[in-house]
Design a protein with these regions (language model features):
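C-terminal transmembrane-helix exit sites in multi-pass transporters
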Residues: 113-135, 256-275
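Hydrophobic/aromatic residues within transmembrane alpha-helices
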Residues: 30, 38, 97, 103, ...
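Helix-helix packing/entry segments at the starts of transmembrane helices
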Residues: 106-112, 183-196, 232-263
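Transmembrane alpha-helices of multi-pass small-molecule transport proteins
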Residues: 34-89, 169-173, 192-208
Length: 298
């Protein structure tokens, strides 16, 4: 049974990785629509799906006369707000990067999030960081510089920095999710709150600079939202079936999918510096993965 759940966890995580890679391709395919408008549609679809799931949970809770999923403490609301704020920064940064970088580069910078999660869990949850993961984090940051390529060429540097901050925002958001898990907050409530918050943040930017869309662009953005929802729920079911210490490394398959889709759709090929950055970051993720796996057995 444990092996069966492990296989399910891996399959769900690879499905999630492919879905997020597909989302990245759709973001780029949508063309010259402002990234905030793209993010709005991504979050709107996710909100609709998550709210439907949340409504079902609430209905079940009422039938069983158990605690309402909407009944939360002040501390829970604070971490929901922090998760939504930093998650929104993560999405906006990621979408801006996807519009201006190779989609594999943008995906890799966003995948810095697990390293940031380790750091933020230290500050938020008091979780100890061992020497090996700390060295891996430092090396991964060095690897990210090969992708960012700091320079006075703002055309590349600013989108790269946005991609880096997308990983930072996502990392803080995941640390908040860890904290919310300790309060037994409904995952559907977390996703619903975050998606609605991001939608509302996007609205003023869309009103200031509305851009008409063709039917094709609308359908692509609908696909963006569906792919994002698939990725979000895939990762949720993955970690429901198996612990992160045994499957998290498979999340980096998104980089492979992104590179393939980027080549097929846009003829994008990462340069040698980006490729070296990928190798360093994924290698450090593997170091942390196997280190945690070994420690979980002792």
């Amino acid at each position: 049974m444990e092996n069966e759940n492990l296989k399910k966890g891996i399959l769900f995580l690879v499905f999630s990785a492919f879905s997020f890679a597909l989302m990245g391709m759709f973001v780029r395919l949508a063309g010259d629509i402002p990234f905030m408008q793209k993010a709005f549609f991504r979050n709107l679809v996710s909100f609709a799906i998550a709210f439907f799931s949340l409504a079902k949970e609430e209905k079940t809770a009422r039938l069983q006369k158990s605690k309402s999923v909407f009944k939360i403490s002040g501390k829970e609301f604070l971490f929901l707000l922090l998760r939504a704020s930093c998650g929104s920064i993560g999405i906006f940064g990621n979408f801006y990067a996807l519009d201006h970088l190779n989609i594999a580069d943008a995906a890799m910078l966003n995948k810095m999030s697990p390293f940031f999660t380790l750091l933020f869990c230290f500050f938020l949850l008091g979780e100890k960081i061992e020497l090996i993961p700390l060295l891996a984090i430092s090396t991964a940051f060095a690897g990210s510089l090969l992708i960012i390529k700091p320079s006075f060429n703002l055309t590349h540097f600013i989108p790269s920095l946005a991609g880096f901050f997308s990983g930072m925002g996502a990392g803080f958001a995941y640390a908040c999710v860890r904290k919310l898990h300790s309060y037994n907050t409904s995952p559907s409530l977390i996703i619903t709150f975050f998606s609605l918050f991001s939608c509302l943040i996007s609205v003023p930017f869309i009103l200031i600079n509305p851009v008409p869309m063709t039917l094709k662009q609308f359908l692509i953005l609908l696909g963006t939202g569906l792919a994002a929802a698939g990725g979000q729920f895939g990762i949720t079911f993955a970690y429901y079936n198996a612990p992160a210490s045994k499957i998290s490394i498979f999340d980096y398959s998104q980089i492979i999918f992104s590179a393939i889709l980027g080549f097929i759709a846009f003829h994008q090929i990462p340069d040698i510096f980006s490729f070296l950055g990928y190798v360093i970051i994924i290698s450090m993720a593997a170091v942390v993965f196997f280190y945690n796996r070994r420690n979980s057995r002792t």
